[in-house]
Amino acid sequence: DLGAAVVVLDVETAEVRAMIGSPSFFDSRARGQYNAALARRSSGSTLKPFLYALAFDQRVSSPATFLPDVPTPFASYIPENYNRRYQGPVPAGEALAKSLNIPAVRLQRRVGTGRYLDLLQRCGFNSLYRQPQDYGLTLCVGGGEISLLDLAGAYTVFPGLGLWRPPGVLAVAGGDRRSRNRIFSPGAAAAVLEALSTPDHLYRSGVMPRGYYGPSLGYKTGTS
């Protein structure tokens, strides 16, 4: 049986507008009472945007910097792209949009796993509590476990132009005390948002047909 979960957030306030943990709560055969939106699963490639924004802020890279997408051993770890093909030098923004693994692992090595992990924890990924060496260079390609709710909440940092606050589920009497924290510069957040919402990115994936002129849309996949 197929499973699914959905989390919808208001990107301005980070308030949860909808959360669906399973296709049917009353379907016991499909474990319908199991809330998959709160379950921890491999992050796949969904954490790459945070790595790229960090690299842009540290001036390790820019969206136009060419990153080598070639077979590269990192000691005993030899990452591959999902299609096992390589594109040679690729601009960082395009490497993010295409979710290429090798450029991302290269960036993580340059940025530093400890610094990357600290950033993810500041974005609300409390499930990533182990030491940097426990994740190694696989952190950006699925080496950690996160929940869909935490992921949706963290992604509000990009339309928020670098500002993030924890997702809120219930209205709080007396006002909202969830402060907004600066995670990225506005420029780094905007660069990531642009890479994930270009027409070519949307058309190539089939998310939107050519000629679409509706509201702006960005997306990132994560295979686990």
Regions found by a protein language model. Name each.
Residues 1, 6-10, 19-20, 26-36, ...:
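A penicillin-recognizing enzyme superfamily signal
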Residues 11, 26-28, 56-65, 126-129, ...:
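Secondary-structure transition/capping motifs at alpha-helix termini
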Residues 5-9, 18-21, 66-68, 140-142:
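Soluble periplasmic/extracytoplasmic beta-strand elements of cell-envelope proteins
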Residues 41, 85-86, 97, 220-224:
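Short Gly/Pro-enriched turn/cap motifs at secondary-structure boundaries
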Residues 2-4, 15, 46-47, 62, ...:
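Extracytoplasmic
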Residues 13-14, 35-67, 95, 151-159, ...:
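Active-site SXXK
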Residues 61-116, 160, 164, 175-198, ...:
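Conserved catalytic neighborhood of penicillin-recognizing serine enzymes
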Residues 78-81, 112-153:
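Mid-domain, small-residue-enriched loop/turn segments at the edges of structured enzyme/sensor domains
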